[in-house]
A protein has these predicted regions:
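Catalytic domains of cell-wall/extracellular-matrix polysaccharide-remodeling enzymes
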Residues: 1-66, 73
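Structural recognition of the beta-strand scaffold that forms the well-ordered cores
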Residues: 12-15, 81-83, 127
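Flexible loop/turn segments at secondary-structure boundaries
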Residues: 22, 90-91, 135-136
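Short secondary-structure boundary segments
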Residues: 52, 84-86, 130
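Catalytic grooves of carbohydrate-active enzymes
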Residues: 69-95
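C-terminal domain-boundary segment and adjacent tail
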Residues: 96-141
Length: 141
């Protein structure tokens, strides 16, 4: 249904289908089972990313800036989405979720000078799903 709605509405969806270095490392062979859907997404004119990193949730909050910097330096060329759940937790946030420290660590990593400098030094281009969709429209299926 997720793929179907994305295609029908021409809304970009999270579809990793390139080299899948981190996606395979984190999710094993189940990533390969997505291939038929990825071909369908691309053929329908939607963007497909090269890789997906989801492992940062297990990083200790204090180590996130350094770990993210190392990850950025190790990325292969292409489009990689790195999932974070950045938040400035309120007083009640810990009552809603046990991940408030992790989310605060995500925010601190994403706004750190270390990560900002790494992005600049590695010539990493930050992008949005809208920009990916605009680029995809310029490419033939």
């Amino acid at each position: 249904r997720y793929v179907k709605i994305g295609i029908e509405k021409q809304i970009p969806i999270l579809a990793p289908g390139g080299h899948l270095t981190y996606a395979t490392k984190e999710n094993g062979v189940s990533v390969q089972a997505l291939k038929p859907f990825i071909d369908q997404v691309w053929s329908a004119g939607l963007p497909v990313i090269d890789d997906l990193h989801t492992d940062s949730y297990g990083w200790h909050a204090d180590s996130k800036p350094e770990r993210l910097s190392q990850l950025l330096k190790a990325l292969k060329p292409g489009i990689t989405e790195i999932l974070f759940h950045a938040s400035e937790p309120s007083d009640v946030f810990p009552l809603i979720t046990g991940s408030s420290e992790s989310r605060k660590g995500d925010l601190e990593a994403l706004t750190s000078d270390l990560v900002r400098n790494t992005i600049k030094e590695e010539n990493i281009i930050l992008t949005t799903w809208k920009e990916l969709m605009d680029r995809r429209r310029k490419v033939q299926p």
